[in-house]
Amino acid sequence: MNNTKTIKYTDRQITAWLRGLLTVAYADGHFDPEEQELIASLTQDELLPCTDLGSLETISPTELAQELGDDSHTKENFLRTAVMMAIANGVYSQPEANVVHDFQEALGLNVEALKSLESTLWHPEKSEIPEGLKPPEESQGDVLQPVKNWLDGIDIKDPRVARFVCKMVPSQCPFERDITLFGRKIVHIPPMCKLNPLYEQLVGLRFRSLSFLADDCQEDVSPYL
């Protein structure tokens, strides 16, 4: 049976955690409606029901480090969810990487695996349309394997973090679709499982989170299915 202990973070830690995710979402200058809806649902329904989304602000690396405390597992778990927020749409931009790097330094962490993720950075000056995280050539091996292993190390011990993962990662791979304007196709969006080579990894984390909520917390997980 699962022996995972349930450890809840304090409200101050969760507030700082959420503000950190907001900071990542704002990093590239585009706070999409999908990101707004996700953060709002996490705030109102899952993490801090009494907190108004509009009252939340971005957070500096120094303040984040102070609020999260000294526990290395807590700090690294936060950083994992911050990376998940950054790569959820299949694109890892330089502004997002900068925020993640600043958070990592302030938290006193040195995650070697993140260097492999930086090799996938999208450079808008070279491409008008994000092409997503690019898997390596076969001859290079899987350069993203280190970050996959690192993401897999997240501790799912707080139900609010587990709910975050379940909300963050869709239950099914989003279908490919065409974006049209005045009846003319302007861009084709491939399915997320092809766009983002880390998508399968995120799905695995989602399954672990569902299992934690159902088995350890005895929660009804049907809303996430």
Question: Where are the regions that the model predicts?
Answer:
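Small-residue-enriched hydrophobic alpha-helices in membranes
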Residues: 1-225
